[in-house]
Each structure stands twice: as C-alpha cells, then as structure tokens.
Amino acid sequence: MLLFTPGPVAINEEMRSSFSQPMPHHRTKDFEKIFQSVRENLKKMTGLEEVLLLSSSGTGAMEASVISLCQKELLFVNAGKFGERFGKIAKAHSIKAHELVYEWDTPAQVDGILNALKANPNIDAFCIQACESSGGLRHPVEKIAQAIKETNPNVFVIVDAITALGVEPLEITHVDALIGGSQKAFMLPPAMSLIALSQKAIDRIEERNVGFYFNLKSELKNQKNNTTSYTAPILHTLGLQRYFELVQNLGGFEALYQETKRVALASQKAVLALGLKIFPKSPSLSMTTIVSEHAKELKNLLKEKYQVQFAGGQEPYKDTLIRINHMGIIPVYKSAYALNALELALNDLDLREFDGMANTTFLKQYYEI
C-alpha cells in the first residue's frame, strides 16, 4: 500500500531504521548530546531563538502555546477543523476568544484580522494555520503576521505550521510561536510536537508559570540543559537526528523545498489535465486537494484496486474531497504512480477515458520538458 495521506505520512526505510536502534536512556549524557544536536538543527531550520520538543501530538503544542502566551483574549482564524481547534482550546481554558470564520477554500484576509484587533483591544494573542490541512489551504501567514506586528507589536502571533514546516521556507520575522508535528514532513509516527519561539515569546513564558505537563517555563529551563521535564520522546528524537542527515544528503533544506514544490506543482497540473478541480483558492504545497462528487468512490477504488491510499475530507466535505500528500522525502516515481492510478480509477468509474494524461503532464512539468 502506498500511503499518500497528509499525515500520518509514509515512513521510508531510512526513517524506520532509526527506530531499530538500541534504546538509550533519556537521562544520560549520550542522549543529551543527541537531544542538543536535534534542537540546534531545529533552530536553524525554523530561524527562531528557541525550540522545545514535547511528547504529544501537534494539538498538545497548540494548547501549550495558547495557555503560555495568551493572558487576556485570543483571536483565531477558523477555515477548517484545525483552525476551529484553537477556539476549542481557548474554551477549555476559559480564555475569551474571537473567531474569524472563512470558507474552507478561502485564505484569511489581512483587513478582517486588523479590524478584529482594533475592535477588541484586549486581544493579546492571534492564532492561525500556515496550511489548514482540512482543505489544503495556504494562508498568507507572513503577510498577516507583519500587519499585526505593525498594528500592535504586543500581540503574540502563534502559527500552526504542522503541515508547512519542512515543506517550504517560512518567513518567521513576525512570528512568536511556530508549531510542528512529527507525523508530517518529518516522516515520523505521531506523538512528538515542537514549538519554535521568538525572544518575545520566551520572555512571556519566563514571566508566567501555567500548566503542568505543558508548562513551557519548566521545559525551557530543562531543555536549555539538554533534557526534558518529563520522559523525552526518545525514539522520535533519534528519528529527527536521522531526518536531518537525510536532508543534508539531499543537499539541504533548499533542495528539499525545491523538490517538494516541483512535485506539488506538477501534481496540481496533472489533476487539472484530468478535468478535475483543485479545491482551495490558495493551494498549499504540502498537498493537492481535489473536490469532486465522486471523491468517496475514487478514494475507495484507489485503495482497494491500486493500493494507493489518499485521504478524504472532513465534515462537511467528508465525501467530496481527496487530499494527496507531498510532505516528506517521496521518490518521484511514487507520485507518478499515484497520479496514474487516479487516472485509471477515473476510467474504471467511466468518468474519463484513460490516455496517460496524468503521467505525461506530471512528468513534463516535473522535468520542465
């Protein structure tokens, strides 16, 4: 089975082998050296002053960021299930929250966000996804973050980059917390998340003492000494060490980002050549999202007959979206096979006669023929 879901993504052999190493104890000097190396690489990757690793899914990092940085009121963008989650986190902690709702295919707009900030002067934290993976939508987070800081530099900007980190370069000048997750571009199983922090965010965290398991003040103190407050995600840390080695072998992050972009753009062009429609108005490079009334049938047929697993949508698009992953290090022939299988499935359902258009278009675009 070829797994092409946008999280958890397929774990290649090189990454799987990192989990077969003898288990080190997390309170040893040997592990501390690995932990330090991984954190330093993550700092370079994100461009922020500090990076904290947490034993949790990405939702844990979202919660930790909100409770640590928001003292008064929260503003968040809801353009899908993961944007909605910021509001649920705020509610669980009795934080007053202001919601900006957008259609799942529509990126957030700067003007609407600035108007909400001006109308609610107690807002001191703003949350948004870089990529809202419910529909594969890329928000203009860099532009939004800059506008917020120019309007009110005291507002903390929290960006869920779980499906953007490791996919494309992110401009983080105006970002205070950048959230990542292990099961996306890092090609690891779920259960580890990270938060990259600006100096402003670090100062806020050190002033406060909130939470227990997600107490970032405690984690800052310990992780600066290359350890963790509680049990570290040991094998995930070893996996990250291997991930950075693989990226280096590819030629570094610039080469990885360029490769991901080539595959994403070629996939989008192939999908359009098949007469299908791309769902978001501003597509992310992390996935190609197709909207079709036949999405459920196509997805099931692809899995059962062609051994290719794409992701469907979530409510209210459960049966009308197909999401094709581009995150991680994916051999180009696998992407070509997956798109060819999609065209074959269209033929099987009498939706389009097979003529090899998907592969032809994909490979021509990828190799710029």
Curated annotation (Swiss-Prot):
Enzyme kind, highest EC tier: transferase
Gene Ontology MF terms: transaminase activity
Family statement drawn from the similarity comment of this UniProt entry: Belongs to the class-V pyridoxal-phosphate-dependent aminotransferase family.
Reported cofactor(s): pyridoxal 5'-phosphate
Keyword terms: Aminotransferase, Pyridoxal phosphate, Transferase
Enzyme Commission numbers on file: 2.6.1.-
Organism (species): Helicobacter pylori (strain J99 / ATCC 700824) (Campylobacter pylori J99)
A Pfam family the protein falls into: Aminotran_5
Descriptive protein name: Uncharacterized aminotransferase jhp_0673
N6-(pyridoxal phosphate)lysine, modified sites: K184
Top-level taxon in the UniProt lineage: Bacteria
Coiled coil: none
